């Protein structure tokens, strides 16, 4: 009996059509809210608590100016990139599933390989950095309890390696989530955690200011000859500008986030709104944490006023804030790892399409979770990746200094150059027109910022290597 005479067959056919998008892939269900959660999870990292240090290097005027300037730059370039998700038309064109795909559609050539190297090296570096940062936050909980029991002058030495291993085990489990589309719940939890610890940090800083026990501040930040030497002032100023610029960057995963959105309303419009909310929310927290933290600690602001013990009491609240940091980084790790997982798996699928080990999906029932899909290659490869990144984090606990350098190299091409170049190609901006000149001036200024930040990061890395002692407990 044909479908014409079989209503149930027609209905099942309609259901099959409705369950897929215009590109034949599983129907996307992402919304403005899930995209906003992904962005906030990616952007508001524990680095928000180090912004008081950055403001201390720059001072009140330059510090707040740089914060606002890079918020505007990041939002603007993210809107340009959002319009490139589909090509050639931003609403009806063909979908591009990742950043490399977008660059391939608009620019092509060697720029595709440059994009891939910058993006995926940065993503891998971030996951290693998050492993280290999460362990530092968990160590801080143990040290906070020690200081509470034995006094603030007590020697409280705690190893961060067991915490790194525990973080790695959690990531092995979460890494079995098949793709970015399944991360919404994790990003929402992580976003709530980021609001929690940032709010606690702001509250503690306000309490310190209200108590009158505040540090000395200056319009121009740290004072040469008092707080720092002339050379230290220069290097730390470069590093602070870089830290602020990189703290806004989420374009490395913007296309992957946009690829989770349902097609109506148009993805680019939803992504622009989500970017505005994400960047605006981030900027408010950054200014509050940076400026109030600087007001509280002055030119002696610590690198992180929770894990570096800018505060000791109430210890239970500081413990809770550090636990929130660790929980946030659990989700953030996946937000940055999933695009790299998919990149490797898609390339393996293309290279060995007949391999059951790589391509076959098995259905399995897991207690409390229900029916889950298991792929042997995904299980083995992602487990190996997490084990490797955890091992690197253990060997190089100063990797965050390396991460600053990676951020310097990735910020300019991924956040500024490629979005601007693709916008010029898409909108056919006339060469040497006012708009073309303004866009290229923006590219040049951000290139200089990245270069200066890279120099500052290299100096910091050299100092870290000099004092490096492998497998040493954190004092």
From Swiss-Prot:
Cytoplasmic side: 1-31, 74-120, 179-185, 258-276, 336-378, 425-441
Transmembrane segments: 32-52, 53-73, 121-141, 158-178, 186-206, 237-257, 277-297, 315-335, 379-398, 402-424, 442-462
Domain of life of the source: Eukaryota
Region (Disordered): 1-22
One Gene Ontology CC term in the entry: plasma membrane
Tagged with keyword Transmembrane helix: yes
Expression by tissue: Expressed in flower buds, siliques, developing seeds and funiculi.
Topological region Extracellular: 142-157, 207-236, 298-314, 399-401, 463-475
A Pfam family per the record: Aa_trans
Function comment: Amino acid-proton symporter. Stereospecific transporter with a broad specificity for glutamate, aspartate and neutral and acidic amino acids.
Protein name: Amino acid permease 8
Organism: Arabidopsis thaliana (Mouse-ear cress)
């Amino acid at each position: 009996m044909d479908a014409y005479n079989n209503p149930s067959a027609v209905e099942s056919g309609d259901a099959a059509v409705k369950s897929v998008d215009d590109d034949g892939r599983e129907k996307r269900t992402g919304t403005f809210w899930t995209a906003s959660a992904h962005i906030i999870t990616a952007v508001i990292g524990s680095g928000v608590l180090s912004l008081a240090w950055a403001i201390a290097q720059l001072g009140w005027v330059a510090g707040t100016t740089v914060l606002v300037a890079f918020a505007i730059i990041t939002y603007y370039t993210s809107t340009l990139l959002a319009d490139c998700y589909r090509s050639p038309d931003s609403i009806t064109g063909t979908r591009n599933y990742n950043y490399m795909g977008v660059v391939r559609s608009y620019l092509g050539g060697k720029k595709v390989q440059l994009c891939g190297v910058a993006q995926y090296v940065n993503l891998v570096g971030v996951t290693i950095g998050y492993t280290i940062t999460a362990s530092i936050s968990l160590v801080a909980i143990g040290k906070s309890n020690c200081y509470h029991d034995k006094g603030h002058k007590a020697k409280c030495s705690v190893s961060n390696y067991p915490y790194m291993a525990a973080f790695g085990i959690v990531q092995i489990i979460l890494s079995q989530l098949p793709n970015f589309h399944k991360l919404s719940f994790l990003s929402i939890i992580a976003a709530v955690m980021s609001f929690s610890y940032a709010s606690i940090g702001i509250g503690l800083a306000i309490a310190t200011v209200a108590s009158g026990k505040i540090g000395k501040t200056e319009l121009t930040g740290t004072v040469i000859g008092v707080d720092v030497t002339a050379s230290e002032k220069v290097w730390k100023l470069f590093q602070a500008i870089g830290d602020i610029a990189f703290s806004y960057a989420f374009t490395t995963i913007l296309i992957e986030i946009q690829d989770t959105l349902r097609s109506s309303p148009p993805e680019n419009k939803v992504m622009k709104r989500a970017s505005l909310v994400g960047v605006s929310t981030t900027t408010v927290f950054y200014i509050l944490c940076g400026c109030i933290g600087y007001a509280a600690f002055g030119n002696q602001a610590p690198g992180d006023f929770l894990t570096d013990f800018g505060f000791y009491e109430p210890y239970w609240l500081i413990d809770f804030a550090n636990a929130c940091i660790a929980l946030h980084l659990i989700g953030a790790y996946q937000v940055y790892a999933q695009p790299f997982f998919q990149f490797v798996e898609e390339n393996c699928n293309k290279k060995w399409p007949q391999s059951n080990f790589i391509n076959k999906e098995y259905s399995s029932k897991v207690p409390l979770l229900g029916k889950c899909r298991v792929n042997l290659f995904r299980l083995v490869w992602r487990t190996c990746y997490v084990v490797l990144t955890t091992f690197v984090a253990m060997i190089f606990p100063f990797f965050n200094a390396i991460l600053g350098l990676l951020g310097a190299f990735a910020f300019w091409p991924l956040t500024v150059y490629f979005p601007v170049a693709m916008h010029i190609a898409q909108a056919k901006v006339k060469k040497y027109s006012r708009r073309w000149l303004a866009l290229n001036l923006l590219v040049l200024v951000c290139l200089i910022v990245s270069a200066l930040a890279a120099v500052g990061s290299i100096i910091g890395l050299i100092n870290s290597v000099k004092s490096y002692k492998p497998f040493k407990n954190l004092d």
